[in-house]
């Protein structure tokens, strides 16, 4: 009887240890991702509406909404988006500690840092 109780106790203990030790794994998910592109001393507020294999781009300061994009690739922790009408491309990777995406926004041969986070509410704020 004591052997069964000890076995059960250690089994539960191991399950708890594995459950608590599991790292949170963030991934590129569908939704409205908002953030900023840092252009020198200025910040440009942008948004990406990811759905399925598609994506639309919004540039909030310029009031450009629903700009068509091409998703070049998308995997569990990164995405590459081409914006042909702006001659721009962005490559983003999930940051494991906070679930945001960071990367570079390239346009006309120049690169700028970009950071976006998943926004629960799709609101278009005026600058």
Task: List the predicted regions and their residue ranges.
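Bacterial Sec-dependent N-terminal signal peptides
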Residues: 1-28
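Intrinsic disorder/low-complexity segments enriched in polar/small residues
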Residues: 4, 97-98
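Solvent-exposed, non-transmembrane amphipathic alpha-helical segments
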Residues: 4, 75, 92, 121-123
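N-terminal helix-cap/turn-to-beta initiation motif at the start of protein domains
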Residues: 18-34, 50, 120-127
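Central antiparallel beta-sheet cores of small beta-barrel/beta-sandwich binding domains
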Residues: 27-96, 102-112
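Edge beta-strands of extracellular beta-sandwich domains
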Residues: 113-118
């Amino acid at each position: 009887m004591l052997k069964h109780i000890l076995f059960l106790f250690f089994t539960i203990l191991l399950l708890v240890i594995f459950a608590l030790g599991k790292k949170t794994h963030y991934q590129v998910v569908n939704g409205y991702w908002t953030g900023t592109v840092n252009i020198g001393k200025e910040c440009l507020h942008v948004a990406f509406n990811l759905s399925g294999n598609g994506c639309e781009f919004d540039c909030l300061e310029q009031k450009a909404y629903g700009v068509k994009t091409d998703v070049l690739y998308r995997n569990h922790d990164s995405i590459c988006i081409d914006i042909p009408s702006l001659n721009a491309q962005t490559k983003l990777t999930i940051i494991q500690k906070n679930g945001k995406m960071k990367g570079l926004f390239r346009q006309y041969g120049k690169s700028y840092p970009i950071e976006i986070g998943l926004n629960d509410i799709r609101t278009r704020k005026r600058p």
